[in-house]
């Protein structure tokens, strides 16, 4: 390996400039400039222009789907379901598993440690089984 002392000056810059080419085999794409990011939002957009811009702005949305992502277009149950989570987004995994999400509702309480351990601690007689079942499932 070439020592860093030999790469002083322009040598280190040359290595850094050629590093992306060595890794990918092609240069990195240039990031869009600030004016090119601002121009589409600086003036009103006609429907013809919107059809051209939409696939560029939202590539995951199929062309001609009619869905502009606006919640005002939703009606009935679909609109009600939008407000079930944090900021209008459903967070089922966080809410149901850990209880840390928004609008958390737990229907059944978690069994206590004692109720989880007792069935495995010793053989149970029929009389004891009825008492254990009442402890594990009150009501």
UniProtKB/Swiss-Prot annotation:
Residues 45-72 are annotated as: Disordered. One of its GO terms (biological process) is regulation of blood pressure. The keyword Secreted applies. Residues 1-25 form the signal peptide. It is found in: Secreted. GO terms for cellular component: extracellular region. GO terms for molecular function: hormone activity; toxin activity. This is Natriuretic peptide Mc-NP. It comes from Micrurus corallinus (Brazilian coral snake).
